[in-house]
């Protein structure tokens, strides 16, 4: 069987993501074994990047 539209109906038996033990978000991938949000299972450090944060506006000193 292919991987087209007909097979998407068979994808509801097991969830792809479950609740993460570390951050509590539904981002822990069962097959890959790590959390997409905090990186639990992949690294001991918390997953964080500068591009994912909102930038604070700096006040001009004029």
UniProtKB/Swiss-Prot annotation:
InterPro entries: Ribosomal_eL37 (IPR001569), Ribosomal_eL37/eL43 (IPR011331), Ribosomal_eL37_CS (IPR018267), Ribosomal_zn-bd (IPR011332). Binds 1 zinc ion per subunit. Its cofactor is Zn(2+). A zinc finger (C4-type) spans 20-38. The gene is rpl37e. Pfam families: Ribosomal_L37e. Binds to the 23S rRNA. Zn(2+) binds at residues 20, 23, 35, 38. This is Large ribosomal subunit protein eL37. GO terms for biological process: translation. Belongs to the eukaryotic ribosomal protein eL37 family. Transmembrane segments: none annotated.
């Amino acid at each position: 069987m292919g991987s087209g539209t007909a097979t998407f109906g068979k994808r509801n038996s097991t969830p792809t993501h479950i609740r993460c033990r570390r951050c509590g978000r539904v981002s822990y991938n069962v097959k890959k074994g790590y959390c997409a949000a905090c990186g639990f299972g992949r690294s001991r450090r918390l997953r964080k990047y500068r591009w994912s944060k909102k930038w604070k506006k700096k006040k001009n000193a004029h």
